[in-house]
Amino acid sequence: ATWNIERLRHKKFLEQILFACEQTQADILVLTETDHRVRLDYPYSFHTPPLTDLQPVFYNPTENRVSIYTNYPCVRQHKTCDGCTALCVELETEKGRLLVYGTIIGIYGNRHPSFQQSLVQQLNDIKQLSDSGIPLCICGDFNCSFSDGYYFTKQGRETLLRTFSDYDIELLTKNEAKCIDHIAVSKRFISNSGIQITEWNQDKLLSDHKGVAVCFS
């Protein structure tokens, strides 16, 4: 599951945000634009560093860009192109090893020049990680919808889809309407599992993003 909680702008709804996260019952939950005041009861959690060193005036001391919460033990962490914006852990699951790459592609949205740079760097990470032979799950804020004209750049969309196709990765949330937070998983990890997709925060009251979860059966 993944959700961008909008830098906890709506911290008066912290209890509801925590409840929404818990209700997913996700074995792997990636939060983006997140905050250490969101404390979830998982045996393992991994976080990009606080952002106050980058821009102390702009960010709260409790803010970070990506957090991964999981019920699975971590074998090791992998280096990414930008340790503040992308986080990769290798987990031991009941279906074998899985690399989870939690990310924000383009922290200022897809219209800012940094989006393309971020996209190129992160797709390079994904190519290198795919070459390791371990199945991959890319999960987070892609700043790109795929099923409609909600929010996307043509180049960004095509580049992501081409890379996923080249590396046998399925974008499971591709057909979700007005959805820019996504979950993409190596086809060999999905195998012949049934897929069920659920969303929450459709009214955007708790943050300006919907949350999305994928359940394998």
Predicted feature descriptions by range:
Residues 1-2, 6-19, 66-217:
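Active-site regions of metal-assisted phosphoester/phosphodiester hydrolases
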Residues 50-58:
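Short, acidic/turn-prone active-site loops that include or flank metal/cofactor-
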Residues 1-46, 58-63:
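N-terminal, active-site-proximal structural segment of metallo-dependent hydrolase catalytic domains
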